[in-house]
């Protein structure tokens, strides 16, 4: 994957979805109609954070390279150099996957 030349604004985050495997360990092929929309993603870039009512910048909790769980229907899909990414708000990130 080539690093996209895009910088999210405010409290937005650019992520690359981690696709669900098409073939399970037992050799069972999963058809596209049976796959759920992926909920795991890798953080590619983060915005500077949002401003509070006093004009102070509140930094985003995730950082580039973090693996995260995201809301199924949050964000906007974008294509950059033929690859699919999602831009979403920090609120659409449910958790950081550790370990």
UniProtKB/Swiss-Prot annotation:
It is found in: Cytoplasm. One of its GO terms (biological process) is chaperone cofactor-dependent protein refolding. Keywords: Chaperone, Cytoplasm. CDD domains: cpn10. One of its GO terms (molecular function) is metal ion binding. SMART domains: Cpn10. Its main location: cytoplasm. InterPro entries: Chaperonin_GroES, Chaperonin_GroES_sf, Chaprnonin_Cpn10_CS, GroES-like_sf. The keyword Transmembrane helix does not apply. One of its GO terms (cellular component) is cytoplasm. Together with the chaperonin GroEL, plays an essential role in assisting protein folding. The GroEL-GroES system forms a nano-cage that allows encapsulation of the non-native substrate proteins and provides a physical environment optimized to promote and accelerate protein folding. GroES binds to the apical surface of the GroEL ring, thereby capping the opening of the GroEL channel. Belongs to the GroES chaperonin family. Heptamer of 7 subunits arranged in a ring. Interacts with the chaperonin GroEL. This is Co-chaperonin GroES. It comes from Methylacidiphilum infernorum (isolate V4) (Methylokorus infernorum (strain V4)).
């Amino acid at each position: 994957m080539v690093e996209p030349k895009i910088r999210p604004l405010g409290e937005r985050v650019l992520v690359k979805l981690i696709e669900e495997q098409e073939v399970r360990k037992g050799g069972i092929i999963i058809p596209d109609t049976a796959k759920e929309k992926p909920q795991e993603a890798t953080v590619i870039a983060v915005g500077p954070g949002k401003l509070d009512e006093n004009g102070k910048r509140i930094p985003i909790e995730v950082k580039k390279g973090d693996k995260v769980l995201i809301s199924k229907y949050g964000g906007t899909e974008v294509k950059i150099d033929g690859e699919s990414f999602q831009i979403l708000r920090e609120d659409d990130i449910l958790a950081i996957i550790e370990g």
